Amino acid sequence: MPRHALQGAGLGFRRELIPELESGVPEAIRFFELAPENWLRMGGRSAKQLRAFTERHPFVCHGLSLNLGGLKPIDTELVTAVGAFMHEHGIGLYTEHLSWCGDDGMLYDLFPIPCTGEAVRHTAARIRQVQEMLGRRIAIENASYYVAPPGAELSEAGFIRAVLEEADCDLHLDVNNVYVNSRNHGFDALAFIRELPLERVVYMHMAGHYVEPDGLIIDTHGAEVIDPVWA
């Protein structure tokens, strides 16, 4: 399964940005990222606009709902549809959150996976299933969380490392998520990053967040990136 390396800065591809981007993509933008779930059943003008961009610019897919850490079987119809979408648009890289987001139905939020050996084996097997179906390596993204699951046998960084090794997949490093978690749960963000297998990183997320009145930091991607995250 091939590895994929990205260079330069990317931008999240949103429909509301299309009119401005059609007039010219800034030279600083070297690739775009999109959530395939938002485009799989898209037709008409929006589909044509997307095609015009994927023909001229590199894209990556960043999934929202594969539920890698969940107990419900992997949605193979979704994986098949994502694979066809990637082939249609010439997209080489797919990433997903290292989290769970549903059981009998979709919960529309991302929840942390317990840091246990059993969860490592369970999640890694599901990642391998997805990679086999897609015929390519995928990357998993470290997620933000606000309550840590009980019964941890591994540190969060140790859990991520173990899943990456067991599944033989790559890492989509979200620097803002590391910062948010470090502030909310009281650990050293740089030490956390140093514990990760950085040779597996395919690209990084830089984003903003919101600070609640009580000091809790929420990962919203709705504000400017602050200096400590850049650092």
Predicted regions and their residues:
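Conserved radical SAM core fold
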Residues: 67-68, 101-107, 210-217
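Acidic-and-aromatic substrate-binding clefts and catalytic sites of carbohydrate-active enzymes
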Residues: 18-19, 36-46, 67-77, 146-154, ...
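Acidic (Asp/Glu)-rich catalytic clusters
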Residues: 21-27, 44-61, 77-92, 128-133, ...
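Gly/Pro-rich active-site loop or hairpin
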Residues: 41-43, 73, 110-120, 181-231
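Active-site acidic/histidine proton-transfer and metal-coordination neighborhood
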Residues: 75-171
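Conserved, mostly hydrophobic/aromatic
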Residues: 32, 94, 138, 174, ...
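Active-site beta-loop-alpha junctions enriched in small/polar residues
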Residues: 14-16, 34-39, 64-67, 98-99, ...
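Boundary/entry segment of secreted carbohydrate-active catalytic domains
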Residues: 1-21
